[in-house]
Amino acid sequence: MNLEIVSLNKEYNEPWNRFCGESNDAWFWHTTDFVDYKLNFRPALESKSMSFMVKEGKEILCICPLFLEKKDLDNEFVYEFSFGGDYCPAPAFKNGLTESRREEILKLVFSVIDEKARKYDVERVSFRINPLCHNFLES
């Protein structure tokens, strides 16, 4: 089956949040409640959600919270992918994927991010793995 990139929208809030509750990589920062909070956290950043998921059929395999934000660097505006001015949460994967499958999906995720970065002239992106998520604690 083919992998599909789907943008996060209200239609997918429930499955996205359910995925967050099931994935050992996800934490509260990945949920749509926190995404909505961060979108409104610092209005000066003019945050726009670029969050997306990777699906195979009806199954979500990975989610990636991502915002396009405008940052003022000494009166020069640049665009970056961030999360209310902070690091973006690292992509979260479905439990039980093999390492090779995770790598395949991660390559796709970063190719999508690269494509969006070129489209919007993004200067940088930073991700953070939450130290409270299950997979980090178990490593």
Residue ranges and their predicted role:
Residues 1-139:
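N-acyltransferase acceptor-side catalytic subdomain
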